Amino acid sequence: MSTAAVQDARKQAEALDNEDSIAFVRDEFNIPTKAQIASSRLADSHPAALPASEDDAKCIYLCGNSLGVQPKRTVTRLNQYLTTWATQGVQGHFKPLEESPLPTWLDADAKAAELIAPVVGANVSEVAVMQTLTANIHLLMSAFYRPDINGRHKIILENKAFPSDHFAVETQIRHHSLSTEKSMVLIESSSKDNIISTEEVLSVISAHADTTALLLLPGIQYYTGQLLDIPAITAFAHKHGIFVIWDLAHAVGNVPLYLHDWGVDAAAWCSYKYLNGGPGCIGGLFVHTNNSVVTKEITDEKPEEGYNNRLAGWWGNDKKTRFVMANKFHPVAGAAGFQLSNPSILDITSLSASLEIFQEAGGMEALRSKSLKLTSFLEATLGHMKEEDRAHFRIITPSKSEERGAQLSLMLSDGLLDTVMKELEARGVIVDERKPNVIRVAPAPLYNTFKDCVLFVEAFSAALEVAKQHAL
């Protein structure tokens, strides 16, 4: 960028940051310093808050699409949980403690469901905090994928699906003694940037409508950052009698979702990206009310009737009879009836600490409002780079704001990625790479600033210059 362009971008960023009505929540997070990310030693103690004058010492962290940063209150909440365990032992399951903000362990998952429901646009009864993403996808498919080789047996997914989704589909098909050659349909993109148009999705559905049992798609595509038209695709699939599951790993906490109103059948997500739950933290699933009702009183004589069959565990059993130990499964109505084992309270406590901040920030609509501005500003600032630098990358994420979340994916010219990533890290910038040529940059509205976007573009410009010289 030219000196004038840099100065202008910094002035714009300062003005936008001053206007940011949710800027206060940035202080709720531990953003690593440049010194910390450069160090190979474990810090002696938990990172302390930096004085405002030292904000420049923080790294430029634009990697919330891979792993969100740590909320400061996570340590407080985890210590409260550990203190409960240390001082109460097994009583922590049932005994509420005065002056503790934490629910009893028996109720921890239900409280977390209350916190996550507005994030995904669901009734509380339609969500469960449980397991991990791929495990939940398997659980949903085990309940709702009932193939008939003489009728509906196919599963449709995108050809560039995240590998774990692909593996789940393949193994579910084989589990039913079917072949992927006959029962798996891949949606191919005609775009050089792997963008899947809604028309392409609908065309594939139409072509296989009578033989398709299930559709599995990402709410936001992990590689390109494309936001798919969830309500339109869901409605079209339903017209053809197809059950729809959405993988919301990159959508939850990123864009507003209205799963109940959209009539989504089921969905699953992780919690360590935009939800900031921590590495490998507990996942979640959504099952629409229409698919999770207990239609009549379950009797001991016919315990398999009255609800949709699923792989079951005792934590999905009605709380009234859960501890009777009668070995007769009476599921909770709603998504909670799909739970298996008692969940990790450590995980739920960590996730809930972050979800508290979502509430304080005003919910997903407020975050989306800022996110739209952040990502558009980042895109515009990249457009002000020198022409000779812009010739070495292109943005493959859709340019329309309604077709993307926070992430911009930058496709670099061949041979530049490794050097660019090394140079960015040396300049205190953390982003995500996807071989062979893509950098994924995701300003998260909870803790990123417009200034972060400018500083990234400055560092990216310098990194490109070095990479081009190395490539000669």
Curated annotation (Swiss-Prot):
Pathway(s) this gene product operates in, as recorded in its UniProt entry: Amino-acid degradation; L-kynurenine degradation; L-alanine and anthranilate from L-kynurenine: step 1/1; Cofactor biosynthesis; NAD(+) biosynthesis; quinolinate from L-kynurenine: step 2/3
Record's catalysed reaction(s): L-kynurenine + H2O = anthranilate + L-alanine + H(+); 3-hydroxy-L-kynurenine + H2O = 3-hydroxyanthranilate + L-alanine + H(+)
InterPro entries: Aminotrans_V_dom, Kynureninase, PyrdxlP-dep_Trfase, PyrdxlP-dep_Trfase_major, PyrdxlP-dep_Trfase_small
E.C. number: 3.7.1.3
Keyword Transcription listed: no
Binding site for pyridoxal 5'-phosphate: L133, T134, F162, P163, S164, D165, D247, H250, Y272, W314, N342
Keywords: Cytoplasm, Hydrolase, Pyridine nucleotide biosynthesis, Pyridoxal phosphate
Quaternary structure and interacting proteins, as annotated: Homodimer.
Function: Catalyzes the cleavage of L-kynurenine (L-Kyn) and L-3-hydroxykynurenine (L-3OHKyn) into anthranilic acid (AA) and 3-hydroxyanthranilic acid (3-OHAA), respectively.
Descriptive protein name: Kynureninase 2
